[in-house]
Structure formats: C-alpha cells, structure tokens
C-alpha cells in the first residue's frame, strides 16, 4: 500500500512577531494541534522578518482523498485559530 504525502508550505503575516520566541508563541496553538495528530508533521522556520512567519506541514496517509481532506481541514483550522493572514502558500504532493 502506497503512502500519500502532501507538503504544505505557508508564509503568514503574524502581527506583533519580532523575534523567534514570539514566533513560536504565535504558532503554539498549531504546535499543540499537530502534536495531537498522528499523521501531521510540523516544522517552523527560524524568525527572519518582523510580522512574518514561515512553516511547513506534511500530512501523511494511505488514501489520497483522505490526505487531501485532512489538508483542507488543516488549512481551515489555521485560518480560524492562528491570528494572522496567509501571504503565500505552496501545496504539493510528494
């Protein structure tokens, strides 16, 4: 059975983020959410610019449609739970 992997790369406007610790604090709800999921991996890029944050997620599963639905759910979750706005995104199958 083939594994399906979907890479989601996001750059977000995150107000009041001006250091690595503030970036981690702004994304802490996402870190907690991903920790509770068995099929999602998260990596946060080091702080680079004021009010900006970049991170990548990998959604893993056996069924391509389920991975796609989980990815869409994850993006909706980020949009509603993280204070900020998506500036750029790149979503691809691995």
Cite the ranges covered by each PLM segment:
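Short, flexible turn/loop "capping" segments at secondary-structure junctions
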Residues: 1-7, 48-52
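Short glycine-/aliphatic-rich beta-strand segments at the starts of folded cytosolic domains
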Residues: 4-16, 20
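A structural signal for short, well-ordered beta-strand segments
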Residues: 8-12, 55-57, 89
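Ordered, soluble secondary-structure elements with a strong preference for glycine-centered loop motifs
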Residues: 17-25, 68-69
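Short amphipathic alpha-helix segments
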Residues: 21-39
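Short beta-strand elements
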Residues: 38-46, 85-92
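Short, charge-patterned binding micro-sites
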Residues: 44-61
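C-terminal structural segments of small proteins and small subunits
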Residues: 60-94
């Amino acid at each position: 059975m083939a594994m399906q992997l979907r890479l989601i790369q996001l750059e977000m406007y995150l107000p009041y983020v001006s250091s690595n610790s503030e970036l981690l604090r702004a994304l802490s709800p996402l870190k907690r959410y991903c920790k509770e999921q068995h099929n999602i991996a998260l990596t946060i890029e080091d702080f680079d610019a004021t009010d900006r944050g970049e991170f990548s997620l990998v959604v893993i599963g056996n069924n391509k449609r389920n991975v796609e639905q989980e990815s869409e759910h994850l993006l909706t979750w980020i949009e509603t739970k993280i204070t900020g706005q998506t500036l750029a995104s790149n979503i691809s199958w691995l």
